[in-house]
Amino acid sequence: MRKILITGGAGFIGSALVRYIINETSDAVVVVDKLTYAGNLMSLAPVAQSERFAFEKVDICDRAELARVFTEHQPDCVMHLAAESHVDRSIDGPAAFIETNIVGTYTLLEAARAYWNALTEDKKSAFRFHHISTDEVYGDLHSTDDFFTETTPYAPSSPYSASKASSDHLVRAWLRTYGLPTLITNCSNNYGPYHFPEKLIPLMILNALAGKSLPVYGNGQQIRDWLYVEDHARALYCVATTGKVGETYNIGGHNERKNLDVVETICELLEELAPNKPHGVAHYRDLITFVADRPGHDLRYAIDASKIARELGWLPQETFESGMRKTVQWYLANESWWKQVQDGSYQGERLGLKG
């Protein structure tokens, strides 16, 4: 049985990973999360009673607390997901992204290195530090049919993606300089259950159900590759346990869609699954409203995920159609979860860009 320390484990992707490990493997999990607005213990409720689950409310920028967590829990692997991750908020307030994504990653690397150096030789060789990153570090695929590969040069275009690119470089440097056994994954856009409603898909679902406008940036022609979060969780565990030290693996869903098409798909599913519309709404798609585009908005992201398929045998199980149906059904069936999120600090806006 491995013990896996997961930073950001109360977040969207992190909680999906925790639920997967507890439900589908025999490994134990220690979640480290400072519970910012996007961290939600309700997302961990399905597994919180497991004897293989532990939770530490700790900021990854707190070196002393991290040292305590490593000493007390003695993990065999670190999976680092703690990050500020919303592009709009990074434009409005980049400082938190620099602090968490760069300084926090540095602090975690140093805590992990000190712990790793004190391990026995067999435990040192088995230890892994898996850093979870984004395809946004590669920049934009404007006017091409190319795909991001593991060797695509970095060209981040937002404060968020620049901070994640910085953290990727730190992780690689800690392997080359100190020998810390690291791996990196870069993923495409995730969606699915327990997604915080500042992001496109849950925001559109909940706005439509409330009869609110569905804001689409620019002309809605921006293209993203969509990855169902439970497919991503399987991929992350696969890389952490079977990936090769020093390697980078791109994880994508093979589902490129224009943003406008995504919103229209949501509207079509709601017509079928939630036919009792809010007062005054004839068709959900009538709520679509085009708004001023995001500054520096990348036109296209698309991932070539052939390496992880070829070398580790991972493939996504959900198509965009099956994953979107599951996602809409989950939000319709779990009103209590998203109502409690909305009752907190978040009030159904695209956070950031306050002018």
Swiss-Prot record:
<dbReference type="GO" id="GO:0009225">
    <property type="term" value="P:nucleotide-sugar metabolic process"/>
</dbReference>
<dbReference type="Pfam" id="PF16363">
    <property type="entry name" value="GDP_Man_Dehyd"/>
</dbReference>
<feature type="binding site">
    <location>
        <begin position="33"/>
        <end position="36"/>
    </location>
    <ligand>
        <name>NAD(+)</name>
    </ligand>
</feature>
<feature type="binding site">
    <location>
        <position position="259"/>
    </location>
    <ligand>
        <name>substrate</name>
    </ligand>
</feature>
<dbReference type="GO" id="GO:0009103">
    <property type="term" value="P:lipopolysaccharide biosynthetic process"/>
</dbReference>
<protein>
    <recommendedName>
        <fullName>dTDP-glucose 4,6-dehydratase 2</fullName>
        <ecNumber>4.2.1.46</ecNumber>
    </recommendedName>
</protein>
<feature type="binding site">
    <location>
        <begin position="59"/>
        <end position="60"/>
    </location>
    <ligand>
        <name>NAD(+)</name>
    </ligand>
</feature>
<dbReference type="InterPro" id="IPR016040">
    <property type="entry name" value="NAD(P)-bd_dom"/>
</dbReference>
<feature type="binding site">
    <location>
        <begin position="215"/>
        <end position="217"/>
    </location>
    <ligand>
        <name>substrate</name>
    </ligand>
</feature>
<feature type="binding site">
    <location>
        <position position="224"/>
    </location>
    <ligand>
        <name>substrate</name>
    </ligand>
</feature>
<feature type="active site" description="Proton acceptor">
    <location>
        <position position="160"/>
    </location>
</feature>
<comment type="pathway">
    <text>Bacterial outer membrane biogenesis; enterobacterial common antigen biosynthesis.</text>
</comment>
<feature type="active site" description="Proton acceptor">
    <location>
        <position position="136"/>
    </location>
</feature>
<dbReference type="InterPro" id="IPR005888">
    <property type="entry name" value="dTDP_Gluc_deHydtase"/>
</dbReference>
<dbReference type="GO" id="GO:0000271">
    <property type="term" value="P:polysaccharide biosynthetic process"/>
</dbReference>
<feature type="binding site">
    <location>
        <begin position="160"/>
        <end position="164"/>
    </location>
    <ligand>
        <name>NAD(+)</name>
    </ligand>
</feature>
<feature type="binding site">
    <location>
        <position position="189"/>
    </location>
    <ligand>
        <name>substrate</name>
    </ligand>
</feature>
<feature type="binding site">
    <location>
        <begin position="12"/>
        <end position="13"/>
    </location>
    <ligand>
        <name>NAD(+)</name>
    </ligand>
</feature>
<feature type="binding site">
    <location>
        <position position="100"/>
    </location>
    <ligand>
        <name>NAD(+)</name>
    </ligand>
</feature>
<feature type="binding site">
    <location>
        <begin position="199"/>
        <end position="200"/>
    </location>
    <ligand>
        <name>substrate</name>
    </ligand>
</feature>
<feature type="binding site">
    <location>
        <begin position="81"/>
        <end position="85"/>
    </location>
    <ligand>
        <name>NAD(+)</name>
    </ligand>
</feature>
<feature type="binding site">
    <location>
        <position position="134"/>
    </location>
    <ligand>
        <name>substrate</name>
    </ligand>
</feature>
<feature type="binding site">
    <location>
        <position position="190"/>
    </location>
    <ligand>
        <name>NAD(+)</name>
    </ligand>
</feature>
<feature type="binding site">
    <location>
        <begin position="293"/>
        <end position="297"/>
    </location>
    <ligand>
        <name>substrate</name>
    </ligand>
</feature>
<feature type="active site" description="Proton donor">
    <location>
        <position position="135"/>
    </location>
</feature>
<keyword id="KW-0456">Lyase</keyword>
<dbReference type="InterPro" id="IPR036291">
    <property type="entry name" value="NAD(P)-bd_dom_sf"/>
</dbReference>
<dbReference type="GO" id="GO:0009246">
    <property type="term" value="P:enterobacterial common antigen biosynthetic process"/>
</dbReference>
<dbReference type="GO" id="GO:0008460">
    <property type="term" value="F:dTDP-glucose 4,6-dehydratase activity"/>
</dbReference>
<comment type="subunit">
    <text>Homodimer.</text>
</comment>
<comment type="pathway">
    <text>Nucleotide-sugar biosynthesis; dTDP-4-acetamido-4,6-dideoxygalactose biosynthesis.</text>
</comment>
<feature type="binding site">
    <location>
        <position position="85"/>
    </location>
    <ligand>
        <name>substrate</name>
    </ligand>
</feature>
<comment type="similarity">
    <text>Belongs to the NAD(P)-dependent epimerase/dehydratase family. dTDP-glucose dehydratase subfamily.</text>
</comment>
<comment type="function">
    <text>Catalyzes the dehydration of dTDP-D-glucose to form dTDP-6-deoxy-D-xylo-4-hexulose via a three-step process involving oxidation, dehydration and reduction.</text>
</comment>
<keyword id="KW-0520">NAD</keyword>
